[in-house]
Design a protein with these regions (language model features):
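Conserved G/P- and acidic residue-centered "switch" motifs that form tight phosphate/ATP-binding loops
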Residues: 27, 41
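Short hydrophobic/aromatic beta-strand micro-patches
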Residues: 43-45
C-alpha cells in the first residue's frame, strides 16, 4: 500500500507554512509494502539557520496523526543514525 494522493496533499498542505525545506517519505509506505498497521515515516530538513523545539515537533506529530488518522514518525534528516540514513537514502521519496 502506498499513500493516497489525498494523504500526500494533506501532508503538503500541512507543511506549506512551516519552516521545512525538504520533506521525504521512507519506510513501508515508500516501498509500497505498508499495511493497515503501518506508520508513516517522514524525514525533514529545515530552512537554513532554523531550529524547531521538541514541543514544536510534538505539535507537528499530533496534528499530522489527527489529519491522517495514522501514527506518524517525524525525524530531522541531520539526526538520523548512520545505519538508518543508508536505508533512508535508498528508499526516500520526495514530498516537498
Amino acid at each position: 500500500m502506498y499513500l493516497t494522493n489525498q494523504q500526500i496533499e494533506i501532508i503538503k498542505n500541512y507543511f506549506s507554512d512551516k519552516p521545512v525545506n525538504k520533506l521525504y517519505l521512507f519506510g513501508s509506505y515508500a516501498r509500497g509494502d505498508a499495511d493497515e498497521n503501518s506508520d508513516i515515516d517522514l524525514v525533514f530538513s529545515l530552512h537554513k539557520d532554523t531550529r524547531i523545539s521538541y514541543f514544536g515537533l510534538a505539535k507537528y506529530l499530533v496534528d499530522l496523526e489527527k489529519k491522517l488518522n495514522r501514527k506518524v514518525d517525524l525525524v530531522e534528516e541531520e539526526l538520523l543514525y548512520p545505519r538508518i540514513k543508508s536505508i533512508f537514502d535508498r528508499e526516500k521519496k520526495t514530498i516537498l
